[in-house]
Amino acid sequence: EAIDSKKKAYYGGMYIFFLIGCIITGVVQVGVIQYSIKMAGAFDRYFVNGMNLPYFSGFTFFFILLAVLIWFGLKIAAQKSWHFLRLGLWCFSFMLIGYSTYLTTMIRSSANPSVDMYNVDNPMSLVGYLGREQYGDFPILYGQKFTAQPRDTKETGTKYQKSKDGYSEIGKDFKYLYSPEEKMVFPRVWDASNDQSHADYYANFLGIGKNRDGSYDREPTQFDNIHFLFGYQINFMYFRYFMWNFSGKQNDVQGTYQGNIRDGNWITGINFIDNMRLGEQSKLPDSLKLNKAHNKLFALPFILGLIGLFYHFKKKGGDAFVNFLLFFFTGFAIVIYLNQAGNQPRERDYAYVGSFYAFAVWIGLGVLQIKDWLAKVAGANIAPTLATTVCLLAVPAIMVQQEWDDHDRSKKVIARDLAKDYLESCAPNAILFTFGDNDTYPLWYAQEVEGIRPDIRVINSSLLGIDWYINQLRYKVNQSDAIDVIWSADQIEGRKRDYVPYQANVKFPDNAYYDLYDVMKNYVGVDKPEYMDNSRGEPINTFPVKKVSIPVDKDAVLKNGTVNATDSVLSELRFDISKDRLFKNDLAVLN
């Protein structure tokens, strides 16, 4: 009975400390990681704007003040023998020391390198960078369903940006408000956006249809919500990746939706198991069966890991629980925190590698259990050698044999070769527009690392809707000259000219063509009341014409070979703007 009571107390304490650990993790995630930098940014803004001190003065003062408070706290904790306070302060201190590595981001950005994403050169921009503001906000514990319609908006804060006279206000932060009946606890189906078909993915996954007007024929229930959590977020977006590493992989074709039995699934290599889950695998075409990433591990790493897990809990329950926490918080907890919407653009297995490491610990401990079993059969002397040999052949050797060919990146050079071909095909001092990460990063690598065609200016059109990226075009990069953006940094700051609607103006008859430069600089770029639309509650710049022209320098196009000497050359290029609303990235291209 005494032993049983000790066990109850032991496991009861484990559960309590697990909950405490979850709370501490939340405090660290929000309080330390986010609000320490937010407070430092607020101090810097006050010191710069309110006291006319240099940038970083308030930022530096905040952390000096914090260090002094920690020192006093440690001193008091030592005098009062408050051990938990001392431990907490030391933990907090070391977290800040580790967190301080993000200072290198500001140091690098302040040097204005040619590749300077987000331009994090001051404390206020660091706040947005670390807060992942560019990715938007999403609910975790309570929030809207994907079928909900916003009822109102609420101002949540002010956005600031470094300018020549201090930190200037560039707009407000808002969040949508929803009615309580359109919210749910622990929302997993929350994203109403269909830019990447997120909402439609939810609907298809849950069997929700559409009405003729495009609305959904019912709202998701809490059962639907949990079904999506387990069916998609945990099973498809975590467990599938987990089993790739420890059971086997069908092929390297991206799995874009659950129910696709052909692409990107996990397998075992054991026919009757795989056939039950994915259909008759022998009927797959040779292009998939002979895919280098068709890896059969026979679930041996997974089985050995389970053996090690049970062995660990049997021998050292406390240590096993620590490793379980690492496994949980770098796996399932990340699934819950990320709250990924459906139809992800790429596989996300890299996000959970920490939990794979934790499971690998149990694979190693599984060898000890195999050793104990073999000792009963073959004897204690030979058991360690035999267990090591058997496990080495059963797990690492098979993994090498099955996976080395598709994990060897030494000959996968298509991204680099395409980037080189793109750059080499351009005329001298050309401007090369790209779209998205996959198009752009190989080009940057080719230019920055291998020095291929540094005279070409690579412009990522996906980033042209952001002021800091447009401003970077004003400067010479490598051997490519600066670009005249027409508008000043003040004219595109923050949310200024984020979008510009078309509004006809009687002064501009719609049967004529107008010089694009003149329209952009002297109409769209001017804040005169008569040029602006006030119907939306605040003045918004407009563009008055859809027929525009660009003058052609005949001598230049003949000299550079764009046209032949025998060709006739137009005096101007004419085109029509088909859109009724131009966003900042559209305007940047036109400029």
Residue spans for each PLM region:
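ER/secretory pathway lumenal C-terminal domains and tails of membrane proteins involved
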Residues: 1-352, 359-429, 444-591
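Residues that form or flank phosphate/diphosphate-binding pockets in enzymes
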Residues: 441
